[in-house]
Amino acid sequence: MQERFPLPLVSLLAASFAVLSLALFGADPAGSPRWWAQLVLLALVFLALLLRYRVTDEWKDFAHDSSVYPRRPLQRGAISVRTLMLLGIAALALELGGVVAVSGGPGLLAYLPVLVLSAITAVEFFARRVLARRFTLSFVLHELVYLPLFGWAAFALGAPLTAGTLAGVAAGTLLFVVAEVVRKFEPRFAPDGAMVADTYSAVWGRTAAIVVIVLSLLASALLAVAAGAGVVVTVVAAAFCVAIAALRRSDRAVMVLGGLSVPALAAAMLS
């Protein structure tokens, strides 16, 4: 579980989602009892969603992982298919329970696009062979789920349908694009030593992947300001971009700085 779903890191990402949503769409004062309740529920929904995605990916990518990553938990028998299925069912139940708790019945309807997109993702948009040959298209399609996810968060928190709210949805989406590129930035290698073409640095090249991280950070910060966040978020984003550029030769530095930029920008949006 820890190997494929590191709970501390995933929990930090879930907290970042909740903080960002409250910063851009919330109406209650930060630190109030209702604010904390919403924070916990939003984080819980996102955590459960990520767990459901993890379970889906283990099933969806089983053949690929068995070929190039034979020591992963499912491949080496450390976890059974039955246990994986039970985890997925539990994650879905927790996710839907959190959605209803934070947004009620109407919110469940608003969350439906997230469920539909994630279900289509599980079958690779019914175009597995096509997407296997088009890495960037696959990336874009998979990241689309953040648009309805942040749209649901805005609805759940009572944000009006304005240009500022739409800017907030885009800001959140781009910030979590950073998280995704960072997650699969470092090159991976098959048992025979060959580089596996399933990471962003391997397919796009390190420079292009870093450019995507930096531009997404800056665009997210600017959109957050358009959504009502303070200008301090642009300062924080610029600082991370400069640091990433300065340490761009180190995979570890890019991953650590890129990963830390997500909760840092989310927190800065509260100001």
Predicted regions and their residues:
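Topogenic membrane-insertion module of multi-pass membrane proteins
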Residues: 1-58, 132-133, 142-145, 153
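Small-residue-rich segments of transmembrane alpha-helices in multi-pass membrane proteins
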Residues: 11-19, 75-78, 137-155, 199-208, ...
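Helix-coil boundary and interhelical linker segments in multi-pass alpha-helical membrane proteins
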Residues: 18-42, 94-109, 148-170, 221-230, ...
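Transmembrane alpha-helical segments that form the membrane-embedded catalytic/substrate-channel core
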Residues: 47-58, 116-127, 148-152, 170-189, ...
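Solvent-exposed interhelical
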Residues: 54-93, 173-223
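Intramembrane alpha-helical segments
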Residues: 83-158
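Hydrophobic, membrane-inserted alpha-helices
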Residues: 90-98, 215-223, 239-244, 261-265
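Extended hydrophobic alpha-helices typical of membrane-associated regions
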Residues: 128-131, 231-271
